[in-house]
Amino acid sequence: MFEFRNTRSTQSERQALRHKENPYISQPLRSCLEAQSAENQRNKMIRNISICLAFACLTVVTAFGQQDPQMTQWFNDLAAFNIGAAGNDDLTHVNIWYRDQWSGVNGAPVTTMLNAHTKVDFVPGAFGLQLYQDEIGQESNTMVKLGYAYHLPTLTNGAHIGIGLNVSLFSKSFDANWIAVDDWQSDPAIPQTNGSGTSTDIDFGVFMRKSNEYYAGLSMTHVAEVQMTSLNIIPTRHYYFMGGYNYPLNGEELILRSNVLAKTDLNATALDVNVNVLWNNFLWGGLTWRQGDAVAPSAGIQYRLSKKEGITSSEQVFKVGASFDVTTSELNSYTPGTAEVFVSWAFKFLTTPVENKYANPRFL
């Protein structure tokens, strides 16, 4: 979910009230698009959009910073968006995303993210680790998160509840080499030299799941809203609500899975609704609708491998998924869409202790 707020945008904000507001397009970007709407040459338009993206990234006087990364296949790893979901099964999970947003537009967001979490035996819960790198225009964002989810005792109906907390280190940097679209030197919001800053923050999440039947969760990111050092930027608090339900259509062979994710910073709200079908616990395909932004078909495979040899046993699950967001916003004339790839490895290796037996020679 990418949104940039510029405190100096007054006339453009009033103009936007006459149109349907798209929470995925910043106000400076929208203003630039409208100003260039009379252009007929496609190549010029793409260049202008790229300039607008760079401008939007840098207008940050007492503004909220870069939003959290957006992923279409978020339902493949709920713990990436709610630390309370970490360790909701007995496997260790390692998941990687790559997302190329608005393909073909120079300076558009490119996001890489790794999320790992594992259940442990020495405490009632799980630990998580998340790394992500986000590049957009002349702006670069890096986040490192370490988290723990405490698992409450299983409820009488078989549901499990996790309460989690992330501690994060957030780094942001700007490159001053950019193309201005107006008299930028008179605007103190725009840095004239390269700049960078860091901040620490926390995330919080509560998650409930009943086996493979349903789940629900509520989480917050940037809870502390700590201003970044050397930059006049405050990452804004985000709220996430997620929920899902699985409907068996043909026993366990065919399962209809529904997922919903609502994201808001109490000013702009975005909604993701996904429906997909899992066949034979191996092949899945579905469709995601994102409010005011895109329709995204997605598909993937998952393969489970169980093995036992002597005193050792293992269980592994491999997943690969891909999606393509077909843009439905104002950018649909300038980009074919957004490509995303998801890869996951979940595993558990066990060694059964050898039972020592003692015999009395008298009874041999």
What are these regions (language model features)?
Residues 1-8, 12-68, 346-364:
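Cleavable N-terminal export/targeting peptides
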